[in-house]
C-alpha cells in the first residue's frame, strides 16, 4: 500500500519537536517514521535501546551528537546512521544550531502513542515514571551509560 503524508497534514507535537509521519499500523507493519527537531543544549533522548527495532537516523539540518554502544559520534547534514536492535543509543543537538533529523524504525512496535506520551511529559501533564513504565509496550528500554553522562567532560567525539 502506498502512503503519502503531506507536510501540512502531519501531526506535530510542539513541546517535544516531533512530527509524526507514519506508524506501523499505517505501513502494514513495515516501519514507523517521524521527524524531530532538537534544540541546542537540550537532551533529545536519554540512553535507551530497542530489543526488536532497528533505528535509522538521517540528518536534515544541523548536527546531532549520538551515543551508539559506548561511542560518541557527531552526525552532520546528509549523514545516515543505522543502530541495530539491542544497541544502547542516545542523541541531542550538537553545536549551537537546532538539529533536524528523520527517523525510521523497522521491526518496531507502533510508537505514536509513545511520542504522544512524551509530549505530555514535556508539557508537565504526564509523569516521567509513566513514560518509563511503558518500556515493554513501546520497546523503549532505558539504560545507564557512563559515556553519555561524561560526554561534556571528555572529548571522545568522532566526526563521521
Where are these regions (language model features)?
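A short glycine-rich, His/Asp/Glu-containing loop-to-beta-strand
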Residues: 10-47, 53
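Short acidic-glycine-tyrosine-enriched beta hairpin
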Residues: 4, 70-88
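Short, conserved beta-strand element in jelly-roll/cupin
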Residues: 35-39, 49-68, 104-106
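Acidic/histidine-enriched, glycine/proline-rich intrinsically disordered or flexible terminal extensions
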Residues: 116-160
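Short beta-strand segments
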Residues: 45-47, 68-73
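Ligand-binding loop in jelly-roll beta-barrel domains
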Residues: 85-112
Amino acid at each position: 500500500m502506498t502512503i503519502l503524508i503531506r507536510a501540512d497534514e502531519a501531526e506535530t507535537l510542539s513541546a517535544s519537536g516531533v512530527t509524526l509521519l507514519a506508524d506501523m499500523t499505517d505501513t502494514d507493519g513495515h516501519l514507523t517514521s517521524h521527524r524531530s527537531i532538537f534544540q541546542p543544549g537540550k537532551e533529545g533522548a536519554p540512553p535507551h535501546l530497542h530489543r526488536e527495532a532497528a533505528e535509522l537516523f538521517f540528518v536534515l539540518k544541523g548536527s546531532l551528537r549520538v551515543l551508539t554502544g559506548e561511542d560518541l559520534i557527531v552526525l552532520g547534514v546528509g549523514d545516515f546512521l543505522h543502530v541495530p536492535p539491542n544497541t544502547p543509543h542516545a542523541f541531542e543537538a550538537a553545536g549551537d544550531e537546532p538539529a533536524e533529523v528523520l527517523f525510521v524504525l523497522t521491526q518496531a512496535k507502533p510508537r505514536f502513542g509513545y511520542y504522544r506520551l512524551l509530549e505530555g511529559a514535556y508539557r508537565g501533564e504526564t509523569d516521567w515514571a509513566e513514560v518509563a513504565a511503558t518500556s515493554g509496550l513501546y520497546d523503549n528500554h532505558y539504560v545507564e551509560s557512563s559515556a553519555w553522562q561524561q560526554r561534556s567532560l571528555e572529548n571522545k567525539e568522532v566526526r563521521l
